[in-house]
């Protein structure tokens, strides 16, 4: 199962990885932590992840997200907020 808080993220995953297109995006029950899901075999998603890793070409993840026209600017703000929280843990 692949879960997301933002439906658009799963739509982009399906756009970029045709093997996921035959799997329907479903909305989970109210109150669940991740609202959106795709039920996909583990082996299929493992191939998707391997392709994603092989295709990494950016030097800065947050910067690449900020430059993407496909992502909501609020997502990039959330990435920076999470980064700031974890930065405080660094010693």
Map each language-model feature to its residues.
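Structured alpha/beta or helical-core interaction and ligand-binding surfaces enriched in interleaved
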Residues: 1-91
